[in-house]
């Protein structure tokens, strides 16, 4: 049997981290079994579904590189298929017309709740549809079994059983003629030959209802794995108040897809004590049965740690492709300056996100408007004029503009003045970057370039001269 899984989001909002983890688990299981992965857009909620949400879901999947083998399929384009089956079910009695008014159903629900009963349809029209004019407003309900139970072995939660008496007759077609979610899902899984359904635990109550529909259609019943919810670090359900919950918000906040995928796979799944997983390792090691039943808490600090790891360990050329988006987003013109892979190599150790990296790289491409006041006050004093002037003279004569050559030049300048490296390096750092902290100033100057370095030293010397005159 060829394994086939699916990710089937509803386009009523953006792709959030819970959905992304579900997609990842479903994708990993398919790939680990040599199977196929299907993307299906469940857009039967015509009022809430939007093209913007569809685009965001696809953009999120593409950014994570969770590529699909089939799809995207859209349920709204398959209404004829669903309605054709519903008509067959009406003909042979597997479904029936229900003429109950909204007022009657509301009163029924209120009465059941008042008496402590579980709200459910009472089957009034189950055998009395002929008492109404055929063209009167109605819905179509599935004739659910009234005896026995539904039992299924969930890959995460073990054996689950529901008595059929707890399940009411689902509406499978609305008054406006639109088929409903629970019915469309079953037909889609049947037609698309889905073998395993991986989804959130909030769907557990839908599962027995859907299994009964599979059986009524004589369709194979897939296996199920219902994964737990993701909580915030305070133990509450993850929401917007915990920070980013949309996948693309993490892109905007400077995370690499590898970091988010690595983090998400560990939110409920583990392999020993291993923390870092490449995608190939995930595929090799992943299994549904190793998913935890317990809810997982989202920890942003852990995600930042992973992001820093991948910024440092991945090929700088690859990281640079993602950095380019942030440089453009922060309106940094990279046409004149070092290459972005060089920027990644310089700054990766010092940054947790690509947003930070882009911001910290600005002085490599643009002249800064002002020098940091605290850094200037401490390091651009009168005593710094001589080291800066001597360094400038040596830099002007330097033919080989490399990190190594610049390091030797700073050492030689300090030695000639009989001072420590810091007495030369710190004034140079503030002069060249405008900041009190940066990577090694030799590496920084190598990327800033000779012309800009000399101009910035001149600016610093002018600052010192003006400061001394004012004192």
UniProtKB/Swiss-Prot annotation:
ATP binds at residue 240. Catalyzes the attachment of glutamate to tRNA(Glu) in a two-step reaction: glutamate is first activated by ATP to form Glu-AMP and then transferred to the acceptor end of tRNA(Glu). Monomer. This is Glutamate--tRNA ligase. GO terms for molecular function: ATP binding; glutamate-tRNA ligase activity; tRNA binding; zinc ion binding. One of its GO terms (cellular component) is cytosol. Binds 1 zinc ion per subunit. GO terms for biological process: glutamyl-tRNA aminoacylation. A motif ('HIGH' region) lies at residues 9-19. Gene3D superfamilies: 1.10.10.350, HUPs (3.40.50.620). Its cofactor is Zn(2+). It comes from Aeromonas salmonicida (strain A449). It catalyses: tRNA(Glu) + L-glutamate + ATP = L-glutamyl-tRNA(Glu) + AMP + diphosphate. Zn(2+) binds at residues 98, 100, 125, 127. Belongs to the class-I aminoacyl-tRNA synthetase family. Glutamate--tRNA ligase type 1 subfamily. The keyword Cytoplasm applies. Pfam families: Anticodon_2, tRNA-synt_1c. It is found in: Cytoplasm. Keywords: Aminoacyl-tRNA synthetase, ATP-binding, Cytoplasm, Ligase, Metal-binding, Nucleotide-binding, Protein biosynthesis, Zinc. Its EC number is 6.1.1.17. The keyword Zinc-finger does not apply. A motif ('KMSKS' region) lies at residues 237-241.
């Amino acid at each position: 049997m060829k394994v086939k899984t699916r990710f089937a989001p509803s386009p009523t909002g953006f792709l959030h981290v819970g959905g992304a983890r579900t997609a990842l688990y479903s994708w990993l299981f398919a790939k680990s079994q040599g199977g196929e992965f299907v993307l299906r857009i469940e857009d039967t909620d015509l009022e809430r579904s939007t093209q913007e949400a569809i685009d965001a879901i696809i953009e999120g999947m593409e950014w994570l590189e969770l590529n699909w083998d089939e799809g995207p399929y859209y349920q709204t384009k398959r209404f004829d298929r669903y309605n054709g089956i519903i008509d067959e079910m009406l003909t042979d009695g597997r479904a029936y017309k229900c003429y109950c008014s909204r007022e009657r159903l509301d009163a029924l629900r209120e009465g059941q709740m008042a008496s402590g009963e579980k709200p459910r349809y009472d089957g009034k029209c189950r055998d009395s549809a002929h008492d109404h004019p055929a063209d009167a407003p109605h819905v179509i309900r599935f004739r659910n079994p009234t005896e026995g139970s539904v039992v299924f072995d969930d890959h995460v939660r073990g054996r689950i059983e529901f008595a059929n008496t707890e399940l009411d007759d689902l509406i499978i077609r609305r008054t406006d003629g639109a088929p409903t979610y629970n019915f469309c899902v079953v037909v889609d899984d049947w037609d698309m030959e889905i073998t395993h359904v991986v989804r959130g635990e909030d769907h557990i109550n839908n599962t027995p209802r859907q299994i009964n529909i599979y059986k009524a259609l004589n369709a194979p019943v897939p296996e199920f794995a219902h994964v737990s919810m993701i909580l915030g670090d305070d133990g509450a359900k993850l929401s917007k108040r915990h920070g980013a919950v949309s996948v693309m918000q993490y892109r905007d906040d400077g995370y690499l897809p590898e970091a988010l995928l690595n983090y998400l796979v560990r939110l409920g799944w583990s392999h020993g004590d291993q923390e870092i997983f490449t995608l190939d390792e995930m595929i090799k090691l992943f299994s549904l049965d190793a998913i935890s039943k317990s809810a997982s808490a989202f920890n942003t600090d852990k995600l930042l740690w992973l992001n820093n790891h991948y910024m440092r360990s991945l090929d700088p050329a690859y990281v640079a492709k993602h950095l380019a988006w942030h440089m453009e987003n922060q309106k940094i013109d990279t046409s004149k300056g070092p290459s972005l892979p060089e920027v990644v190599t310089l700054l990766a150790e010092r940054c947790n996100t690509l947003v930070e990296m882009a911001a910290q790289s600005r002085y490599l491409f643009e002249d800064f408007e002002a020098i940091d006041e605290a850094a200037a006050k401490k390091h651009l004093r009168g005593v710094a004029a001589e080291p800066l002037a001597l360094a400038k003279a040596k830099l002007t004569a330097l033919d080989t503009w490399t990190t190594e050559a610049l390091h030797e030049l700073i050492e030689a300048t300090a030695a000639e003045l009989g001072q420590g490296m810091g007495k030369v390096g710190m004034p140079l750092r503030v002069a060249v970057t405008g900041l009190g902290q940066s990577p090694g100033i030799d590496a920084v100057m190598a990327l800033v370039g000779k012309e800009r370095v000399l101009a910035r030293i001149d600016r610093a010397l002018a600052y010192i001269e003006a400061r001394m005159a004012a004192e």
